[in-house]
Curated annotation (Swiss-Prot):
It comes from the Bacteria. The record marks H17 as: Transition state stabilizer. SUPFAM superfamilies: Nucleotidylyl transferase (SSF52374). Its EC number is 2.7.7.3. The gene is coaD. This is Phosphopantetheine adenylyltransferase. It is found in: Cytoplasm. ATP binds at T9, F10, H17, G88, L89, R90, E98, Y123, Q124, F125, I126, S127, G128, T129. It holds the Pfam family CTP_transf_like. Belongs to the bacterial CoaD family. NCBIfam families: coaD_prev_kdtB, cyt_tran_rel. It comes from Burkholderia multivorans (strain ATCC 17616 / 249).
Length: 165
């Protein structure tokens, strides 16, 4: 049984993320979506909110588990007995960072492979950062996120005082 981990902050989870989950879950016996508690990135949504969002969007996949984690990815991978780390590459600009991370992960976890996947064409330009910015400025994000995620974004922006002018 091959277990893979797809780590990320998923802040918020986009249609691009779901596209990779759908495709990766058809390759591996179990796909663990690891929602990182990355304080360095100063997330828009709390870890608890991101876990709820991910479960709402991904809960219908029978072989996908959504779990939060803190600390090193290597420890999360080991805890889940994963043999593969799945990473998404949207553009060439993502490659340099992801290549360095894959090298470090190989050093820390020599028996674990990193698999890069590119999103489907219609999702290659989507990033959580861009989606958050559009939402905070009052723009339409419905083509980039699922309706439940759009609702979370709308409520969060409203709680912060509404869209910036």
């Amino acid at each position: 049984m091959v277990v893979a981990v797809y780590p990320g902050t998923f802040d918020p989870l986009t249609r691009g993320h779901e596209d990779l989950v759908r495709r990766a879950s058809s390759i591996f016996d179990t796909l663990v979506v690891g929602v990182a508690d990355s304080r360095a990135k100063k997330p828009f949504f709390s870890l608890e909110e991101r876990l709820k969002i991910a479960n709402e969007v991904l809960g219908h996949y029978p072989n996908v588990k959504v779990m939060g984690f803190k600390g090193l990815l290597k420890d999360f991978v080991r805890t889940n007995n994963a043999r593969v780390i799945v990473r998404g590459l949207r553009a060439v600009s993502d490659f340099e960072y992801e290549f360095q991370m894959a090298g470090m992960n190989r050093y820390l976890l020599p028996d674990v492979e990193t698999m890069f996947m590119t999103p489907s064409d219609q999702y290659q330009f989507i990033s959580g950062t861009i989606v958050r910015e559009i939402a905070q400025l009052g723009g339409d994000v419905s083509k980039f996120v699922f309706p439940s995620v759009e609702k979370w974004l709308t409520e969060k922006v409203a709680a912060m005082g509404g869209p910036a002018a």
